[in-house]
Amino acid sequence: MLFPGCRSRALSSLCFCVLVLACVVACQQEGPGGNSSPPPEPASSSWSLVPGKMKEWMESLVTRTRESWQWFWGPRAFQGFVQTFYDDHLGDLGSHTQAWLHSSKDSLLNKAYNLCPQLLCRDSYWD
């Protein structure tokens, strides 16, 4: 059971982590050893680079995640998952239950066929 304040604590922790990350990015932009020149104008400060760096980091993270999970969304992986699920959980059902599953599937397909425009769903598509 979760405590009532857990959600707000998790959100505040996330905000704190984002703030620390922004500080780290800003400090890395200054370079090692400090900077002896006067601080730049507020519009051109290293803080103005944080949104761009965050966007670049998030885009690369999303791209890498999408590429690494691309195999999962392919038809072979999904078909394998469904086949394994059927073998593990549905293969030993009784004939009455299997007949009910088939009739439910047929009913669902008929409803989908009735909702589909005739121009898009020809009879040969459903055979």
UniProtKB/Swiss-Prot annotation:
* A Gene Ontology term for the protein's cellular component: very-low-density lipoprotein particle
Q: Which InterPro entries match?
A: APOC4
Compartments where found: Secreted
Give the signal peptide as a residue range, or say none if absent. 1-27
Q: Which UniProt keywords apply?
A: Lipid transport, Secreted, Signal, Transport
Q: Which GO terms describe its biological process?
A: lipid transport; positive regulation of triglyceride storage; triglyceride homeostasis
One Pfam family name is APOC4
Keyword Nucleotide-binding attached: no
**Record's function text:** May participate in lipoprotein metabolism.
**Would you identify the family this protein belongs to, as annotated?**
Belongs to the apolipoprotein C4 family.
* Protein name in UniProt: Apolipoprotein C-IV
Please give the organism: Orcinus orca
